[in-house]
Amino acid sequence: MLPAAGLLWWVGALGALYAAVRGALGLLGALRVWGIGAGRAALGPGLGAWAVVTGATDGIGKAYAKELAKRGMKVALISRSKEKLDQVAGEITEQYGVETKVIVADFGEREDIYDRIRAGLEGLEIGVLVNNVGISYSYPEYFIDVPDLDKTIDKMININIMSVCKMTRLVLPGMLERSKGVILNISSAAGMYPTPLLTLYSASKAFVDYFSRGLHAEYKSKGIIVQSVMPYYVATKMSKISKPSFDKPTPETYVRAAIGTVGLQSQTNGCLPHAFMGWVFSILPTSTVMNLLMKTNKQIRARFLKKKMKEK
């Protein structure tokens, strides 16, 4: 029998070895993705002539649509504003010379919109699906105090969860027939841990992450890549960030980096600064992360409510 001191030494040594091995593997993985890798999946017409992007008129969705068009893919844009859809479609055709198609659909509605989307996509050889459409809270809030809570619950489920499942249901069979295709599901870093004061949003994005990773495991042997994309803050209308920075990139910068991870990571934070933040959070105890998130969101909530009071 080892004396207590000897046992503690071996426990410490094994713990240090585990940490060193984990750190080395993490470093190798990071080099593979951010240093050497350029994305195994050649996102372009070789996967199929068309890319389909939901929530395509702003932010990350618009950036994906333009990046895929730049790679030679025709793009089907789906969003609720016909005016914005036509504007983005015009920009894409003018800049990249590819065919576009617009489908007007409000994902906050019930399931009947999917018959219209199905009809709009009929006959298209779809190689890439970007499930980007999503909504969040207007500001962090305690669940029961969320404004118009019942409506918010319905919309959050319909837009953040139902759309991902239904769009995948429409597009995946055609990909399976050709044994190739890529589905990019835009989740959020808020789905990596329960996020107090954004609880419903966080839970909906955790669903997207689990759905994506499970689907990838089911269909990767059949030539289908499914990726969960989990950004931190990006300078978009939804995030209310107008000035980009190193850790809060423009949608275009973020998407260029994220596309490079396709085929290398089934779950990605998308760009190097966000990957670093994800790594830092991953080594912290869950309780610590949740306490930090609670503190941060309480501060954001207080600032929002104070500003709202001044405007009255």
From Swiss-Prot:
Keywords: Endoplasmic reticulum, Lipid biosynthesis, Lipid metabolism, Membrane, NADP, Oxidoreductase, Steroid biosynthesis, Transmembrane, Transmembrane helix. The keyword Lipid metabolism applies. It is an enzyme of class 1 (oxidoreductase). It catalyses: a very-long-chain (3R)-3-hydroxyacyl-CoA + NADP(+) = a very-long-chain 3-oxoacyl-CoA + NADPH + H(+); 17beta-estradiol + NAD(+) = estrone + NADH + H(+); 17beta-estradiol + NADP(+) = estrone + NADPH + H(+); 3-oxooctadecanoyl-CoA + NADPH + H(+) = (3R)-hydroxyoctadecanoyl-CoA + NADP(+). The keyword Lipid metabolism applies. GO terms for molecular function: estradiol 17-beta-dehydrogenase [NAD(P)+] activity; very-long-chain 3-oxoacyl-CoA reductase activity. Gene3D superfamilies: NAD(P)-binding Rossmann-like Domain (3.40.50.720). GO terms for biological process: estrogen biosynthetic process; fatty acid biosynthetic process. It is a multi-pass membrane protein. The chain crosses the membrane at residues 33-53, 181-201, 274-294. The active site is at residue 201. CDD domains: 17beta-HSD1_like_SDR_c. Substrate binds at residue 188. One of its GO terms (cellular component) is endoplasmic reticulum membrane. SUPFAM superfamilies: NAD(P)-binding Rossmann-fold domains (SSF51735). It is found in: Endoplasmic reticulum membrane. Brain. Pathway: Lipid metabolism; fatty acid biosynthesis; Steroid biosynthesis; estrogen biosynthesis. Belongs to the short-chain dehydrogenases/reductases (SDR) family. 17-beta-HSD 3 subfamily. Catalyzes the second of the four reactions of the long-chain fatty acids elongation cycle. This endoplasmic reticulum-bound enzymatic process, allows the addition of two carbons to the chain of long- and very long-chain fatty acids/VLCFAs per cycle. This enzyme has a 3-ketoacyl-CoA reductase activity, reducing 3-ketoacyl-CoA to 3-hydroxyacyl-CoA, within each cycle of fatty acid elongation. Thereby, it may participate in the production of VLCFAs of different chain lengths that are involved in multiple biological processes as precursors of membrane lipids and lipid mediators. This is Very-long-chain 3-oxoacyl-CoA reductase.
